[in-house]
């Protein structure tokens, strides 16, 4: 999870988040290269006293500054499109977790496991136990098995919310009257935190998301 003063991304806990971090590093390398080149050219031009009034065209230069940016855009676009399609992929055999946004809490259902609605409210700061996190802990955490595909379906009962779990690489709008879906695959057991990522009213900051990933056997025992 995020910590105070953190300068990098959260540790990835799913394959799709690993892919996102790789694309981030790929894009940053290209951007740093462009920034360095433009900065060096700008400094050189500031100190360059040579000029010419007879040169009206430079075919080679014009060709280069047309082809190179186009090549860089393609170099960015191809992995971006691949990642975009990966985000939309979902397993037909994945466990369905339905998240319903309310002002200002979440409720969850797991139809395939016969789990009825679970309301998940933020634990007030005065009720936190030692070691628990302010504004992130909830009274009821939905449990999912790690190492298996999870298909999350998000909707809302009132206004627009957004269900986000950064370490899993998941963020999607929860819109009234509409079902949005994304999948994730937890690589490791643990508790993963997120928050509503769409301003939804006065208590928008107080509707956290907490998901617990456990072993498959433990998950089956909990459902039974």
UniProtKB/Swiss-Prot annotation:
The chain crosses the membrane at residues 27-48, 63-82. Keywords: Copper, Electron transport, Magnesium, Membrane, Metal-binding, Mitochondrion, Mitochondrion inner membrane, Respiratory chain, Translocase, Transmembrane, Transmembrane helix, Transport. Binds a dinuclear copper A center per subunit. Gene3D superfamilies: 1.10.287.90, Cupredoxins - blue copper proteins. This is Cytochrome c oxidase subunit 2. Belongs to the cytochrome c oxidase subunit 2 family. The keyword Cell inner membrane does not apply. Cu cation A2 binds at residues 196, 198, 200, 204. Its EC number is 7.1.1.9. GO terms for cellular component: mitochondrial inner membrane. Cu cation A1 binds at residues 161, 196, 200, 207. Component of the cytochrome c oxidase (complex IV, CIV), a multisubunit enzyme composed of a catalytic core of 3 subunits and several supernumerary subunits. The complex exists as a monomer or a dimer and forms supercomplexes (SCs) in the inner mitochondrial membrane with ubiquinol-cytochrome c oxidoreductase (cytochrome b-c1 complex, complex III, CIII). Pfam families: COX2, COX2_TM.
């Amino acid at each position: 999870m995020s910590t105070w003063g953190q300068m990098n991304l959260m540790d990835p806990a799913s394959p799709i988040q690993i892919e996102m971090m790789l694309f981030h590093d790929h894009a940053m390398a290209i951007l740093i290269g462009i920034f360095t080149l433009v900065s060096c050219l700008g400094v050189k031009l500031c100190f360059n006293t040579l000029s010419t009034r007879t040169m009206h065209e430079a075919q080679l230069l014009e060709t280069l500054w047309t082809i190179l940016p186009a090549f860089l855009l393609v170099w960015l676009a191809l992995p971006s499109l691949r990642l975009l399609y990966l985000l939309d992929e979902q397993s037909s055999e994945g466990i369905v977790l339905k998240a319903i946004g309310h002002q200002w809490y979440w409720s969850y259902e797991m139809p395939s496991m016969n789990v009825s609605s679970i309301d998940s409210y933020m634990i007030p700061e005065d009720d936190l136990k030692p070691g628990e996190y302010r504004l992130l802990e909830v009274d009821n955490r939905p449990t999912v098995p790690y190492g298996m595909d999870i298909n999350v379906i998000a909707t809302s009962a009132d206004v627009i919310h957004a269900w986000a779990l950064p370490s899993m690489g998941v963020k999607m709008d929860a819109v009234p009257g509409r079902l949005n879906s994304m999948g994730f695959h937890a690589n490791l057991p643990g508790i993963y935190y997120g928050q509503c990522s769409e301003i939804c009213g006065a208590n928008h900051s107080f509707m956290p998301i907490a998901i617990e990933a456990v072993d498959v056997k433990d998950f089956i025992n909990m459902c039974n």
